[in-house]
Amino acid sequence: MNSLRNYRLPALGILAGCALLAAAASSCFAQAFGPTLTSPTAGPKTPGADGFISRWLILEPIPANGLTDSAVQAIVKKDYFPDQFTVIPHDGDKVTVGSATLTWHAVDTKLYNVNLYHFAYSLGKPTSNVLFWAVTIVNCPREMPGVRLAIGSNAASVWWLNGKELVGIYGDRQTVIDDGVSKRITLNKGPNILRAAVVNGGGATDFCARFLDPDDKPLKGYTVTLAVPAK
């Protein structure tokens, strides 16, 4: 009996050690994109009380240089990968840009803004003189007229909704809530594809985005997903 018990104790120790390693691995995975970004939870995401969109697919950064209006427009209009203005990527999808293979990553942010510096740094990618692409899907239960897209970014950014350019802000700037606001638009019933290109010169880089209702209050009543919901 004693010899059997002696075998069991090391086995239990090994199992406990494995459990601790698994928990540590899970914790590391949750923090894979820095202290404010995590892998998305299951199911659709609703905007918070202030209306900010917190779920995105982000492509690893592409080298780019220039923050003036003309430079940024030239950067974002350049062809980097197939269907860059129409693709709805999946987490883990890869694209080839020049000689580099870049990956799309799904993230949820814990804050109102998406910290691109944390994102890139955590992946060992450059944070200066780079271009980030971001995509999300806004799902509306009904048509929503008279709304506006309100964005902020560090540094410059250009934004598209359902393939149409809505708003851009330029220069070496800090992220300010509602720094750029689009004209009034209508969100379609069903999925609406929101796409952003953020260009950073150096230092910190992040962005935030929300929709404002006809009274310029945070829009509610929609969900955010990273795939078009099945009909």
Residue ranges of model-derived segments:
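Short beta-strands within extracellular/lumenal beta-sheet-rich domains
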Residues: 128-139
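Beta-strand-rich ligand-recognition modules
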Residues: 161-210
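Aromatic-lined ligand-binding clefts that engage carbohydrates, nucleic acids, or primary amines
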Residues: 145-160, 194
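Non-cytosolic beta-sheet module surface loops
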Residues: 140, 149-153, 198-200
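N-terminal secretory signal peptides that target proteins for export/translocation
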Residues: 1-11
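Accessory carbohydrate-binding/adhesion or oligomerization-edge regions at the termini
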Residues: 30-116, 196-231
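Bacterial N-terminal signal peptides
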Residues: 11-27
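Short structured motifs
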Residues: 118-122, 133-135, 178-182
